[in-house]
């Protein structure tokens, strides 16, 4: 018999979520996953949620789905600045077996009722994903049954991104020098690229574990774009990370940013698929 409950075995949810084939569901320990699931922070150490709830769907004591939802601890003003005066109702995680659509419906209905429908509700909000999964909050493309259910409930796609992964190997580039700043509370690092002592660009790297890192963003100065400097910076960055023991290096970019897609693919990143975030039509 199917039942929805807030009494659940957290290890069941850990195993269940990792059973979904997603390129950014890295092989993480239960303790690492639990920290991200229950009490997560962003790269600067800010708590992501001020309240967070979980409902699980069991059929004869077997987990067939779960939903995690709540209200964020901050949001983004029109100018992009972070503000603690803004909070979003977010469905952070929603996973259920493909052949158990009724479980997904019950879970989503439970979340929507508790979040309220007067304000816009977000699902798979990119920024508020789990740190152990590179805080890539979007839903991977192979979950068509989840996508379909969200759309049945009035959600529409907000943004789509292309997810990339690369395997690092030893490479040398002596022309570009790196200046790395200290790690943030969220284990991220700002790095400057320099040639002949002059800064030509920069990036932000998130270290997920001893062997895996994630590129948040990268840029080169506008006046040197198209001169091959970006490729040299990436070569230097990969060499720097490889020497630190990193062998997997992932990133993502907007689906309509074809320039960035070309850059990543030119520099050895493999396209893994498309991810999406969602929202309802109600305005905040």
Predicted regions: what is each one?
Residues 99-116, 220, 226-239, 243, ...:
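Conserved acetyl-CoA-binding loop-helix of GNAT-fold acetyltransferases
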Residues 56, 62-72, 198-207, 214-219:
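Conserved beta-strand in the GNAT
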Residues 83-103, 218-226, 253-254:
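A short, internal acetyl-CoA/4′-phosphopantetheine-binding micro-motif in the GNAT/acyltransferase core
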């Amino acid at each position: 018999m199917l039942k929805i409950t807030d009494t659940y075995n957290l290890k069941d949810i850990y195993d269940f979520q990792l059973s979904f084939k997603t390129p950014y569901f890295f092989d993480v320990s239960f303790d690492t996953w639990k920290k991200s699931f229950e009490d997560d922070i962003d790269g600067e150490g800010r708590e992501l949620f001020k309240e967070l709830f979980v409902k699980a769907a069991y059929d004869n004591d077997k987990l067939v789905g779960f939903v995690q939802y709540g209200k964020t601890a901050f949001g983004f003003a029109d100018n992009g600045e972070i503000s603690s005066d803004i909070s979003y109702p977010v469905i952070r995680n929603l996973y259920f077996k493909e052949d158990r659509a009724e479980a997904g419906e019950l879970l989503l209905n439970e979340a929507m009722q508790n979040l309220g429908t007067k304000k816009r509700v977000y699902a798979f909000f990119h920024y508020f994903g789990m740190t152990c999964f590179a805080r890539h909050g979007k839903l991977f493309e192979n979950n068509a049954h989840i996508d379909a259910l969200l759309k049945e409930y009035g959600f529409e796609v907000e943004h789509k991104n292309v997810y990339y992964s690369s395997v690092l190997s030893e490479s040398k580039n002596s022309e570009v020098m790196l200046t790395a700043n200290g790690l943030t509370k969220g284990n991220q690092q700002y790095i400057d690229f320099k040639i002949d002592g002059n800064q030509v660009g920069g990036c932000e790297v998130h270290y997920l574990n001893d062997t895996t890192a994630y590129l948040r963003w990268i840029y080169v100065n506008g006046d040197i774009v198209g001169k091959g400097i970006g490729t040299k910076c990436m070569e230097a960055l990969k060499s720097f990370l490889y020497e630190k023991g990193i062998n997997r290096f992932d990133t993502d970019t907007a689906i309509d940013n074809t320039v960035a897609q070309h850059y990543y693919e030119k520099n050895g990143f493999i396209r893994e698929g498309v991810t999406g975030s969602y929202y309802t039509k109600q305005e905040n």
